[in-house]
Amino acid sequence: MNFNKKTIEDIEVSGKKVLVRCDFNVPLKDGVITDENRLVGALPTIKYLVEKGAKVILCSHLGKDASKSLAPVATRLSEMLGKEVVFARDEEVVGENAKKAVSEMKDGDIVLLENTRCRKEETKNIPEFSKELASLADVFVNDAFGTAHRAHCSTVGVTDYLDTAVCGYLIQKELKFLGNAVESPVRPFVAILGGAKVSDKIAVINNLLDKVNTIIIGGGMAYTFLKAQGYEIGTSLVEEDRLEYAKEMVAKAAEKGVKFLLPVDHRVAAEFKDVEATITEDQNIPVGNMGLDIGPKTETLYADAIKDAKTVIWNGPMGVFEFENYNKGTIAVAKAMADADATTIIGGGDSAAAVNILGFGDKMTHISTGGGASLEFLEGKVLPGIAALND
């Protein structure tokens, strides 16, 4: 995939109507936004376009369907920018209200369209809706990395009707850090993979085995790898149908000279509850117990590997992070990354949440804004929302 995409700074935007696809898919509780990270991430692109005298038309999805309105986002964005963001309340997204709001815009004005998923066509990338969206604007800017792996009307379809399609600052930053890490990393390059399932990370491991110096495995997926190596795992989570694959991966890593680190001890309990942990002596987990986090020896092993690295990518927690007794491994990895003299990249999703909760967010080089998108990027897949932009 070509990472050298044109950006907003490469084109003339003054006096133009610019349709910007943002990622405003934020959590709401009683109409209040509970996590504003995605709004903060969108501000640099919006501010640049406003300063350059563009007419800025923002669009985004919110939730899985039409049930939520972007009205609270318009209100909050207005406060953050210190400038009115006109909300075009319109069930058709591009209906009379939206057309009127856009026709009345002056240079530097901002309009936010209603949730793109109010239209059934959006997720099916049906040309009719793409054409309507494109008809509002002269230029398209994609700044929603979180949906770059989806070929929808507002991410890909519009580019069929607008010749100028470039990325905003957020996607530019994602391409810079994720792209460089995958294509030309400063070595040693360490990838840390956690989370519950091996099956979710198969393609990532496959792709990264050709690129990294060390792979570190934690979380529920570690037990499948350990069982494949002949260790006892008690009642821990295991994917029986992935044991053969797990064995192959470890062998493949050895063949390529890639270090493949698995836990050497564990924090375990008799059931899936936040009770005090028992720490195992070694890799084996006693009968009637399940692994819920990596143990202290493993923390040291992993921290040492991170300390020596120059590029680190992390995707997925080391244990059941929601349980206070089983968040130690995740904390240890986050701390090691925060202290490392390396380019540190958090691949969105649970790891990003963990790092922010722990207060290490500002110590990382880059926290990806897309869980699924960053995962597909690490799998080496082409992301349609980025492929559609001008080279």
UniProtKB/Swiss-Prot annotation:
Reactions this protein catalyses: (2R)-3-phosphoglycerate + ATP = (2R)-3-phospho-glyceroyl phosphate + ADP
GO-annotated biological processes: gluconeogenesis; glycolytic process
InterPro entries to which the protein is assigned, alphabetical: Phosphoglycerate_kinase, Phosphoglycerate_kinase_CS, Phosphoglycerate_kinase_N, Phosphoglycerate_kinase_sf
Subcellular location: Cytoplasm
UniProt GO molecular function: ADP binding; ATP binding; phosphoglycerate kinase activity
Keyword S-adenosyl-L-methionine appears in the UniProt entry: no
Database matches in SUPFAM superfamilies: Phosphoglycerate kinase (SSF53748)
Annotated metabolic or biological route of this protein: Carbohydrate degradation; glycolysis; pyruvate from D-glyceraldehyde 3-phosphate: step 2/5
Superkingdom per UniProt: Bacteria
Residues reported in the UniProt entry to bind substrate: 23-25, 38, 61-64, 117, 150
Listed transmembrane segments: none
EC number: 2.7.2.3
GO cellular component: cytosol
Keywords on record: ATP-binding, Cytoplasm, Glycolysis, Kinase, Nucleotide-binding, Transferase
CDD domains associated with the record: Phosphoglycerate_kinase (cd00318)
Annotated binding of ATP, by residue: 201, 291, 322, 348-351
Top EC class for this record: transferase
Complexes and interactors: Monomer.
Family statement drawn from the similarity comment of this UniProt entry: Belongs to the phosphoglycerate kinase family.
Entry protein name: Phosphoglycerate kinase
Lineage: Bacteria, Bacillati, Bacillota, Clostridia, Eubacteriales
